[in-house]
Amino acid sequence: MSRFNLTGIGMTSQRTRDRLVQRLQDQGITDPEVLQAMASVPRHIFIDEALAHRAYEDSSLPIGNGQTISQPFTVALMTQTLCNRPRARVLEVGTGSGYQTAVLASHPHVGRIYSVERLAPLVTRAEERLRAMKVHVRLRHADGYLGWPEEGPFDGILVTAAPRQVPPALLEQLAEGGRLVVPVGTDNGQVLKIYDRTADGLEVTSIDQVKFVPLVKGLR
């Protein structure tokens, strides 16, 4: 039996999640499948119990190891941006808490998910929580800058930390017709960008100003 309360009570109840979804709609999230995923995924199990009462605030929260769980609006925006069409094979760079992974897995446009994380303790924690939710993904302790070349190419790639420049390996692993969603920049400013792979090359679109932890090379 899982040690996680997936249903939640009080500040982690379904009613509280539904209020969050209403706020996301007010902020411009329109994909009903994304809104349903945000309503159904129990964000409170992906953060420390001491912060569970803040799980459904629209804010980022610390998850240890110098990392954060992204604010729900950002998770919803990135999911909506990636899932504009079916994506049979999706690579997530930066598993983190596993929350974004779970939201992706809840979207019907997403097929098989491969997720890499450079911090071993986060891989272990995310794996435990995703298993409790019966979410089936392939996790790997690996350097996100390198992607997952053995499993590419991917129809969708979503990066949950900000590189100064997009790693070439990720562009190489993007299939024709595929979409890469990635925040790019430094602590002084980041922009959420879309890279669409077409028969003629890459089309790049800037979406919004964002704030992510930096994408770091190497393993820990």
Q: Locations of the language-model features?
A:
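Conserved nucleotide-cofactor-binding alpha/beta core module
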Residues: 83-203
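Class I SAM-dependent transferase core
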Residues: 1-91, 99-102, 107, 122-133, ...
